[in-house]
Amino acid sequence: MGARASVLSAGELDKWEKIRLRPGGKKQYRLKHIVWASRELERFAVDPGLLETSEGCRQILGQLQPSLQTGSEELRSLYNTVATLYCVHQKIEVKDTKEALEKIEEEQNKSKKKAQQAAADTGNSSQVSQNYPIVQNLQGQMVHQAISPRTLNAWVKVVEEKAFSPEVIPMFSALSEGATPQDLNTMLNTVGGHQAAMQMLKETINEEAAEWDRLHPVHAGPIAPGQMREPRGSDIAGTTSTLQEQIGWMTNNPPIPVGEIYKRWIILGLNKIVRMYSPTSILDIRQGPKEPFRDYVDRFYKTLRAEQASQEVKNWMTETLLVQNANPDCKTILKALGPAATLEEMMTACQGVGGPGHKARVLAEAMSQVTNSATIMMQRGNFRNQRKTVKCFNCGKEGHIAKNCRAPRKKGCWKCGKEGHQMKDCTERQANFLGKIWPSHKGRPGNFLQSRPEPTAPSEESVRFGEETTTPSQKQEPIDKELYPLASLRSLFGSDPSSQ
């Protein structure tokens, strides 16, 4: 990071950090943006050291500008960052990124006018391309520089690591900037695997070549001296044309950009391959119940890049489906933000949803609702399991226990009042299973009837039959005594009720 931090001097760094990212926005450029730009340039096989000078930034802008129409958001952000850095190097006062882009556009228009004026003064109106890999040597001839092994290695590495994910297309566009059809075929031939995808790409190229031949028929008659023949579809694809013919078409006046045409065909085929390798539709991307909102947004935009739709349709998908397919927790938060909320505000609001803190808050809210409902039931008298009031053994008052009693501690046993033992060891008046003190010297145990009440009115039998009913009962008692002489209960439970 130290080397990347040396891109700007102290004074230039102060100016850099005063420039805003957007007009009227609060965020400003920081050192991390330069670090990110240098890493992106390394990923695109471009020397990050070019950022240290204004001329290097101008070269980077010249390579990135043709890809802005078909490039990704990362490519546009890289272009904007380098453009702003160029203004800082050139000591051009700008307030935000938009103003820096306007300054770059003005400077490019001025340079074009100067070049046209110089060509008119010298009598040479031919606008010769100076773009890499076609350069002009010291003799003024246009020569071709073969694509470097480093570029090929970067392309093969991307295909091996990413297969045919959506980010492969902007990577191919950046690596093939200014390339001839022969260079593009070299890049395609270095792909060893994924032959099914390569076959699909060949079919797309053949279809586009046939469409080119249909729209651009060959003019009848001989070719004028000094003029080149018109390229056919197979010539643009590099199968029936030589390298010198390709350079001639690209540097002719007016030029025929066979390299850019062939590149568009390849990108069209790559889009079909990306759609095949990413079968998931944007409509199927939904946030899981425990998935962080950040991971859901990453999956959403990755699938959105593979969708073959216009930018207006993609904007509608983002505004509608991103909120609609979120989980209930995030959807509630996003709807509360309103339709004009930015992605940064959405991610900040849903940052903790699904994590332990959010779960704890939801659980606390649920518990508070349950507690409130229980309180309402108790107030209405529907709560039956009311706790019994406790009573203190020390002071005899209710509402607290002896452990929390503030009264002076009573000495001795709390049950019998004697000293020398505690209540748990007290043997005074220990109750048996019948609920009374045992042994008892007062007759029968407590669960027996102590006295039988005598009836105050004669029974129904005595009223009906008179003395006939009373005589057998009087005779039955001595018979029972004679048959069961040992049946007295006195020996077991004290006084026998039959002997009373």
From Swiss-Prot:
Gene3D superfamilies: 1.10.1200.30, 6.10.250.390, Human Immunodeficiency Virus Type 1 Capsid Protein, Immunodeficiency lentiviruses, gag gene matrix protein p17, Single helix bin, Zinc finger, CCHC-type. Residues 217-225 are annotated as: PPIA/CYPA-binding loop. Residues 189-227 are annotated as: Interaction with host PPIA/CYPA and NUP153. Residues 106-128, 438-482 are annotated as: Disordered. Residues 14-33 are annotated as: Interaction with membrane phosphatidylinositol 4,5-bisphosphate and RNA. Residues 277-363 are annotated as: Dimerization/Multimerization of capsid protein p24. A motif (Nuclear localization signal) lies at residues 26-32. Residues 7-31 are annotated as: Interaction with Gp41. A motif (Nuclear export signal) lies at residues 16-22. The modification Asymmetric dimethylarginine is found at residues 387, 409. Residues 8-43 are annotated as: Interaction with host CALM1. PROSITE patterns: ZF_CCHC (PS50158). The record marks 132-133, 363-364, 377-378, 432-433, 448-449 as: Cleavage. A motif (LYPX(n)L motif) lies at residues 483-492. Belongs to the primate lentivirus group gag polyprotein family. This is Gag polyprotein. The lineage of its organism: Viruses, Riboviria, Pararnavirae, Artverviricota, Revtraviricetes.
